[in-house]
Amino acid sequence: LVHITKEIPVQYEMGEVEQRLKKKRCGQDDLAGQVDDALMAEYLSRNDKRMTVLGLWGPPGTGKTTAAEVIAEALGRGYLKLNFGGTGDSTFINGTKKSIANAGPSLLIRELARKNGTYSYVINFDEFDKGSTESYQAFHELLDPESTCFYDEFLECSIPKNDLLIILTFNDIRKIPTAILDRIRIVEVSGYSLSEKKQIVKNAVLNKMAERFRVNNLSITDDALELLLHEYAVMPGIRDVERDMEKLLIRMIKNEKKCDNLCISVDTIREVLGSKRSLVLDDKGSKCAVPGQAMALAVSGNIGSCIAIQVVQDPYQKDAVETSGLLRGSCLESLWDAM
C-alpha cells in the first residue's frame, strides 16, 4: 500500500500520444487525433480533484486495448488491464469488509500491489459494457468529481485517485448508464474501410503471422486478399482476419511441409475456409427473391455490409417466432419481410 500511494511525477508532451498511435495503429489517424485532443483538454484544464477518464467505444477487433497500452507508453506511465465484464458486485472497486468470509481488498488494489504499481497508473477497464447494476453503481461513485479518494472496505482507508488515468473500452454504448457516460470523455473508434484493411494485412498482419509461425517470405495474391476481405473477414475489425490467416498458414505448412516461400492463393482460401460467411452486394440480384429470405443492411461507423436473414419453419414448435444472432432495431424489419 505504501508503494501504491507513492507519488510519481506525470509528464505530458503535446502530440506525443498522437505520434505513437499513428505509428502503432495503421489506418487510425483520426483515432490518434481524438485521443490526443481529449488528453490535451484534460491537461490544459487540469483540476487536481478530478481524475482523467476516457471511453474508447467501437466494434470488436479495432484496437481499443492496444490504443490504451500505447497511451500509457507515450505518457511514461505503468499500465494495468482489468476485465470489467462479469463483475457482479461492488467488491471489484470497494473491496470486502473484514467481518465477511474470504474478505480482501478490491481487485484494483490487489492488482496494483501485485505489479508494484502506483496511483499514477493507466487503468484499462475492458468490456465495460458487460458489467452489472451494482458494479456500475460502485463505479459511478468512483467517478465522483468532488472526491479525491475512494474508500476500500477491507483496508479501511481512503486511496487517492486524482492522478489515475482511467480508460474504458466497450462495444455497445447503449448498455452503459447515462450517469456514467456524463462523467467520461467518449472517443469513437470506427471500423476499418476495405482499403485500410488491405494495407493493414500487407503491412502488419502478414509480418505478424510470419514472425509467429517462423515463416520466411510470406505473401498473398491480390485476388486472394480481395476474396478474404469480401467473403470471409466481414467484421469491422481485423481480429477475424488474423484468425483466418492463422488457419491458412497452419494448413499450408502442414500440406507443403515447409516454412519458406509461402503464398496464399484463392484456391487455398476456398479449400481451407470453405463457403463464404455472408452474402455481399453482388449476391443481391440472385438471392432477394428466395422465399423466406431477405437482405438486410448492417452498418458500423463508416463500414457497411449486406447480410441475409432467413426464416425457417419448425413443424415441432408452437406458433411463435424465435430469433438468433445479433438482430436489433431496424434489422428486425427485414425479419418480418422475410416472413
What are these regions (language model features)?
Residues 2-3, 9-54, 339:
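Pre-Walker A (pre-P-loop) alpha-helix and adjacent loop at the N terminus of AAA/AAA+ ATPase modules
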Residues 3-11, 24-25, 116, 172-182, ...:
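Conserved C-terminal "switch" segment of AAA+ ATPases
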Residues 43-51, 109-112, 128-129, 145-162, ...:
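Conserved Walker
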Residues 47-84, 113, 140:
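Walker A/P-loop
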Residues 74-104, 111, 196:
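AAA+/P-loop NTPase substrate/partner-engagement loops
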Residues 116-120, 124, 131-132, 151-170, ...:
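AAA+/SF3 P-loop NTPase mechanochemical coupling elements
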Residues 117-144, 173-182:
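Conserved AAA+/SF3 P-loop NTPase catalytic/coupling segment centered on the Walker-B
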Residues 247-339:
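Conserved P-loop NTPase/AAA+ ATPase motor core
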